[in-house]
Amino acid sequence: MSKLLKKELRLAASPLSYWFLAFALMTMIPGYPILVCGFFVCLGLFQSYQAAREQNDVIYTALLPVAKTDIVRAKFAFTVLIECTAWLLCAVLTLMRMTALSAAPVYTQNAMMNANLVYLGWLAVLFGLFNLIFVRGYFKTAYAIG
């Protein structure tokens, strides 16, 4: 299973999945819809699944001498790892914004949603819905997205 996860991280993952982790820094932009960070992380994961489909990664992996359930577990573990990394980055930046930068005028007079614990909860809901709808739908067919 760990070798399949390494394969997902090194070969099957789209570079966008890693680049879009930097969008967690949007948490620090005042007056910006910060939930867009979660959207970009899900978009990067979608691109990884699409690239894997175009490269016949599922067929290649199914031909390897591994259990078929481990293939699904490794793909899902990759998805959860990227989402947890993004969530942790957002959590660190949110805590920094709530403590060290709480008195900054650009954050106190913010018309949009401030970075707080509710924001982190909505990110978790967004990632959970992505896993429930997209990832589950992908593994019903594995050759059709969603």
Regions found by a protein language model. Name each.
Residues 70-72:
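Alpha-helix N-cap/helix-start motif at helix boundaries, enriched for small hydrophobics
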